[in-house]
Amino acid sequence: MNPSTTQARVVVDELIRGGVRDVVLCPGSRNAPLAFALQDADRSGRIRLHVRIDERTAGFLAIGLAVGAGAPACVAMTSGTAVANLGPAVVEANYARVPLIVLSANRPYELLGTGANQTMEQLGYFGTQVRATISLGLAEDAHERLDSLNASWRSATCRVLAAAMGSRTANAGPVHFDIPLREPLVPDPEPHGAVTPPGRPEGRPWTYTPPVTFDQPLEIDLSADTVVIAGHGAGVHPNLVQLPTIAEPTAPAAPSGGNPLHPLALPLLRPRQVIMLGRPTLHRPVSALLADPEVPVFALTTGPRWPDVSGNSQATGTRAIVTGTPNPSWLDRCAQMNRHAVAAVREQLAAHPLTTGLHVAAAVAGALRPGDQLVLGASNPVRDAALVGLDTAGLRVRSNRGVAGIDGTVSTAIGAALGYERDHHGRTVALIGDLTFVHDSSGLLIGPTEPTPRQLTIVVSNDNGGGIFELLEQGDPRFSDVSSRIFGTPHDVDVGALCRAYHVENRQIEVDQLPAALDEPGSGLRVLEVKADRSSLRQLHAAIKAAL
């Protein structure tokens, strides 16, 4: 037999049996056995293969595929720096709990330290950022032991899948699956050159691991004036729906009858306790409240970890067992303040003479329809969506909130669209800033033979730099002589020309044209650019706060 080819075929077969539906492949020589096996699986309709040149963008494409489809995704690459380029995506997948499998080919381990070409100590490279690091070891040329080797390879692959999906931990995340491969790296002439020893009957995985039930009920008395802060990964809590809730855009939409609370209304209220769902990261008033030692915090999460930046959490669990009844006057007061904050934002946006990222976010939010998927950039766009009162009912909202970097967002959006379209008919809209777009512009490179989103519109709010810094301490007017260069980083990139280089449909429009443009029938991938101003952002946000 051809050991490397046989091993690769077994691994790919077992990944598919374990639920992998999409694999991103980056070209290389050492991973050729995996590439041939993946191509065969793609041709037979067992997986969908996506070939990319850049491993960094490939990793984020896989993240998007995983979150869009709700299934583990795999990215395969050759040895050396190809593996290192997965670092940012692995870190994001770790903190966002995305089931990402890094399937790396390696040189035979005896070549480590010898000066062999394209060889590095890649096993264990990702350290604490992965749920597990698993190696198969070199495939032996021992046909008489094929049944034993088959069992070993399939068993290890199932361990990879269980770790990635958190089947025994309730803590999904990235896994590094490293496979050293010895030549020959290409299949022998068929029919006798390579075989695929069988897996379990009826397509079952070799080792089935049922999902763990992670349940820690926590008793909470609602008679105290309570607010709910719902962040990324909040989960669904129907028995808390009547409470005033500041929900970040990526939190699941509340069932009908919810009680939304605008984040800017929070400083106008005096809550006596907080129920924190998931991991909130967006709003400074929220951070200040969570850090108040006079306000008890109850943290409810869907996994074993819970956020507690200020060390102020009084108790943790996975769901609330409620006692007591909320004070009606408190609920009325919160609803009143929510209406006041929403009106203040709307009025100040209408009065502001220049188009800003907030205006672009408001236009996008108003143009969405039930069944859509929305992908938000991790800098201002996700915050702007929250501030303009995005209604997430009927939407799927995604954003890389694990470590909240802007890198890989274009690729994440493309992956999310491809993943979502597997089982849904809705379109995908992405709202990102210009720096985010430029940073991952190579993500637009989709080869002519590769799957392309059925309907993805990327809206680029282009204020020629980092608008978020206008709102931070670095944007204080006393730093005006240097802040634009070292924080704003203007670039003057021609977004249209960049899109044309990648053969991506694009046009520049005004913000008032955006709703109609988003409503146009169409297919494929396109970019809509809206020019925006960042120099007046500080003034606009100050006006909104003053109106409160």
UniProtKB/Swiss-Prot annotation:
EC numbers for this chain: 2.2.1.9
Enzyme class: transferase
Pfam families: TPP_enzyme_N (PF02776)
The entry's keywords: Magnesium, Manganese, Menaquinone biosynthesis, Metal-binding, Thiamine pyrophosphate, Transferase
GO process terms (BP): menaquinone biosynthetic process
Highest taxon in the source lineage: Bacteria
GO molecular function term, any single one: thiamine pyrophosphate binding
InterPro entries: MenaQ_synth_MenD (IPR004433), THDP-binding (IPR029061), Thiamin_PyroP_enz_TPP-bd_dom (IPR012001)
Coiled coil location: none
UniProt pathway annotation: Quinol/quinone metabolism; 1,4-dihydroxy-2-naphthoate biosynthesis; 1,4-dihydroxy-2-naphthoate from chorismate: step 2/7; Quinol/quinone metabolism; menaquinone biosynthesis
Cofactor note: Binds 1 thiamine pyrophosphate per subunit.
Catalytic activities: isochorismate + 2-oxoglutarate + H(+) = 5-enolpyruvoyl-6-hydroxy-2-succinyl-cyclohex-3-ene-1-carboxylate + CO2
NCBIfam families hit by this protein: menD
Subunit structure and binding partners: Homodimer.
Family recorded in the similarity comment: Belongs to the TPP enzyme family. MenD subfamily.
Protein name (record): 2-succinyl-5-enolpyruvyl-6-hydroxy-3-cyclohexene-1-carboxylate synthase
Record organism: Mycobacterium marinum (strain ATCC BAA-535 / M)
Gene symbol of the encoding locus: menD
